[in-house]
Amino acid sequence: MKDSFKNSWAIYRRLLGYLLGYWKVLLLSMLSMAVAALTEPAVAKLLKPLIDGGFVNKDPQVIMWVPLAIIGIYLIRGLAGFINEYTASWLTGQLVQRLRQQMFAKLVNLPARYYDEHQSGRLMSRITNDVNQVTEAGFNVITVTVRDGLTALGMLGLMLTTDWQLTLICLVVMPAVTYCMRLVGQRLRGLARQNQQHMAQMTQVLAESIQCQRAIKVYGGQEREMARFDHTATSVRRNQVKQSAASAANTGVTQLMIACALAAILYFAGLRAQHGGLTAGDFMVFLTAMLGLFAPVKRISSVSQAMQRGLAAAESVFAFIDEPGEPDDGASALPATRGRLSFDAVSFAYPNVDSPALSGIDLEIQPGETVALVGSSGSGKTTLASLVPRFYEPSAGRLLLDGVPLADIPLRQLRGHIALVSQQVELFNDTVAANIAYGREDASREEIVEAARAANAMEFIEGLPDGLETVIGENGARLSGGQRQRLAIARALLKNAPLLILDEATSALDTQSERLVQAALENLMKNRTTIVIAHRLSTIENADRIVVMHQGRLAEQGRHQALLEQGGLYARLHSLQFSEPQAD
C-alpha cells in the first residue's frame, strides 16, 4: 500500500511538471476556479438576511438589495467560469500535445528490437487512447479538486459559523466515505490497467485486419478474424461492465452515507429550533450549505476513479517515454568514407531464441566491392546486413567502417552513408516526388527525375494522373508491387550513398523491369561498397564475391564460377534453384 502510494505520487508529480511550464496560465485558471467556487457559499450566506430580514421582519431594503447581490455574484461566477473553462481546455491541449510529441520522438528512435517484441496496435493505443486518459489524472483532477475543494471548504466554514454542533454530525460520516473511496479506488485502478490491455489487443486485431485484408479475403479468414475481434471486444465489454459496477458501488455507498447524515441533521436541527437555538434564516443557510456540500464531496470522491484510470494510463505513457532509445554514444567524425567494412568475430542472438542468428562472423569487404549474401531462409543474411546500419547491436564482436568501430560513429552520420532497398518496401502517403526525395529534401526536380529514370520508374510515373505530384496512398497502395519497388530504388539512387544494402531489391519486378533496374543498380554499385541479399542466384552471378551463409556462419565465399566448381553448398543451392520449373 505504501509503495503504491509513493509510485502514484511520483507519477502525479511528474504530470504536474508538465503543467508548471505554463504556470501563469495555470495560476489564472486556479484563481478563476477559486472565485467561481467561493460564489456558492456567498449565495447561501445571503439567505439569512433574506429570510430573517425580508420574510420575518418585513424589511423592504433587504428585499431590494439581496436579489441584486445575487445577480452580481452570478455575473462574477459566469465570468470566472468562462476563464476557467478556457484556460483548462488550453492547458489540457498543451499536456496532450507535449506527451504525444515526446512519445512520437521516442517512437522513431526506438531500436528495431523493440518493434520485434511489441505489437503495433498496443503502440498506437498508447499514443492515442492512453494519452487522452492521462488528462484525467492531469488537469481535470486538479480542476475538480481545487474547485470543489474550495466550494466544500466554503460551505463547511459557513456551516460551522451557523451551527457548529450540527456541523459535527456531518463530519462523522467523512472518515467512512474516505475509507470506502480508497478501497474502491484500488479496484478501479486495476480494472483500468486491464482495460488498456484489452483495448490494445482490439486495436491490434483491427490494424492487422486492415493491413492484411487481401490475405483475409483470399484465404477465407473473415470468420476467423471476426471471432478474434469478437473475443477482444467481449473482453473490453466485460471489463467495462466491471468498471461500471465498481464505480456504481462507490457512488451508491457515498450517497447512502450522505442520506444518513441528512436524516440525522434534519432531526437534530428540528430539536434545536424547538429550543430557540436556530432561526429560520440560520436553518435555511445551514441546509443550503449542507446540500451544497454534498455535490462537491461526491465529485471529489468520484475523482479518485478518474485519477486511478489516469494514473494507470500515465504509468503506461511514462514507461514508454522512459524506454531506452538506440545507443548513440559515438563521437568519431567521418569526413570522407571509403567504404571498407569489417566484421570482427561478430555474433548475434535474438531475445528468447535458443540458437544464435550469427556466430563468429569474420568478413572484410573492400571499398567499392559488391558482396552477395546467399543461403537458405534463416541462414542469417538479413540479420548480418541489419547490423551495418545498427538496427541491431552485435552480441559479441564488432563492426568497423574504414577502421572505426560503428559504435563510435554517431548514428545520424553512419546512416547518412547508407542507402537501403529491402524486399518490404516502405513508402509514405505522399507524392511520388516526396517519396523519392525522402531524406533529401534539398534535391532539385531534375535530380528527382534523373533518379526516377535510372530506376526505370518514369515510364509509369508519367502515366499517373499528376505525375510526380500524384499521392500514392498508404504505403503506396495505389501502385503495383513492381512500381513500389522501383520508387524505393529511385530513393536509394538519389541518396547516392557510398554504402548500399540491397535486400531482395529486384524480387517484386517482372522480367523486363528487372533487367532494366538491374542495369541501373550495376551502374550505381560502381565504386561503392554494396551488400546484396539475394534469393535468385541469377541476379548476383556478377558480384565481386559471393558469401554463402548456413545456420548463422560463413560456409563458403568466392566468385560465382569458382564456387560452382567447388561443388559445395553454393553449387547445391544453384543446382536446386535452376532445376526448379520456371513459372510462365
Curated annotation (Swiss-Prot):
This is ATP-dependent lipid A-core flippase. It catalyses: ATP + H2O + lipid A-core oligosaccharideSide 1 = ADP + phosphate + lipid A-core oligosaccharideSide 2. InterPro entries: AAA+_ATPase, ABC1_TM_dom, ABC1_TM_sf, ABC_transporter-like_ATP-bd, ABC_transporter-like_CS, ABC_transpr_lipidA, P-loop_NTPase, Type_1_exporter. It is a multi-pass membrane protein. It is found in: Cell inner membrane. PANTHER family: ATP-BINDING CASSETTE SUB-FAMILY B MEMBER 10, MITOCHONDRIAL, ATP-DEPENDENT PERMEASE MDL1, MITOCHONDRIAL. Belongs to the ABC transporter superfamily. Lipid exporter (TC 3.A.1.106) family. Its EC number is 7.5.2.6. Homodimer. PROSITE patterns: ABC_TM1F, ABC_TRANSPORTER_1, ABC_TRANSPORTER_2, MSBA. Involved in lipopolysaccharide (LPS) biosynthesis. Translocates lipid A-core from the inner to the outer leaflet of the inner membrane. Transmembrane domains (TMD) form a pore in the inner membrane and the ATP-binding domain (NBD) is responsible for energy generation. The gene is msbA. The chain crosses the membrane at residues 15-35, 63-83, 153-173, 251-271, 277-297. One of its GO terms (molecular function) is ATP binding. Residues 341-576 form the ABC transporter domain. In MsbA the ATP-binding domain (NBD) and the transmembrane domain (TMD) are fused. One of its GO terms (cellular component) is plasma membrane. It comes from the Bacteria. ATP binds at G375, S376, S377, G378, S379, G380, K381, T382. SUPFAM superfamilies: ABC transporter transmembrane region (SSF90123), P-loop containing nucleoside triphosphate hydrolases (SSF52540). Residues 27-309 form the ABC transmembrane type-1 domain. SMART domains: AAA. It is an enzyme of class 7 (translocase). Keywords: ATP-binding, Cell inner membrane, Cell membrane, Lipid transport, Membrane, Nucleotide-binding, Translocase, Transmembrane, Transmembrane helix, Transport.
